[in-house]
């Protein structure tokens, strides 16, 4: 039987994390209400709270970032409108990767096999030049390979090979991504 009472009493965050969460609560309105083209301002705010943000990264003001200090975004990557970055664990987004409109990256879960239901924080890695399309969900501990595409609305709970396109719920391989030019 689950011991929910024990879970609710468990210390899930260190005092340092709690302090940073409170600071982020005060800074977040400066992020959220900044004009849409002010990408540099939002990069500065996130960096000031420990995020590792590369050059020319576009993060839109309506994106939700849970723990800035657990975010790494490579050069020229993008986090789109209303994307939800639930980064209890580290989330790494490679150079020129795109997290589209309303995509959800979830680097947190619970161990359902233990009675106290402890919090787990498996990291997520999005490879360089990968694309997580609109309304897609990427679960805890998943790696999306370089150049891979997660189709719109897909649910990804397993690693995706480099340059592979996955679609559906659960996500399954559709075909290999080919770049023509």
Task: For every predicted segment, state its role.
Residues 1-51, 55-56, 96, 129, ...:
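Terminal amphipathic alpha-helical/low-complexity segments used for targeting or macromolecular assembly
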Residues 54, 112, 155-158, 172:
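Short, electropositive, low-hydrophobicity segments enriched in small/polar residues
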Residues 34-43, 63-73, 78-143, 169-170, ...:
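Flexible, glycine/small-residue-enriched loop-and-beta-strand segment within the central core
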């Amino acid at each position: 039987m689950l011991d929910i009472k024990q879970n609710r009493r468990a210390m899930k965050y260190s005092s340092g994390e709690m302090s940073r969460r409170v600071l982020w609560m005060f800074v977040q309105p400066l992020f959220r209400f900044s004009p849409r083209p002010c990408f540099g301002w939002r990069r500065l705010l996130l960096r000031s709270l420990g995020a590792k943000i590369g050059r020319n990264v576009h993060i839109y003001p309506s994106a939700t970032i849970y723990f800035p200090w657990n975010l790494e975004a490579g050069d020229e990557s993008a986090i789109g409108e209303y994307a939800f970055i639930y980064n209890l664990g580290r989330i790494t987004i490679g150079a020129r990767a795109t997290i589209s409109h309303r995509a959800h990256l979830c680097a947190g879960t619970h161990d359902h096999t233990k009675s106290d239901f402890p919090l787990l924080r498996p990291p997520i890695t999005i490879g360089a030049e990968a694309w997580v399309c609109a309304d897609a969900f990427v679960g805890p501990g998943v790696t999306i390979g370089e150049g891979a595409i997660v189709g719109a609305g897909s649910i990804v709970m397993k690693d995706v090979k480099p340059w592979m396109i996955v679609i559906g719920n659960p996500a399954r391989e559709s075909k290999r991504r080919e770049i023509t030019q």
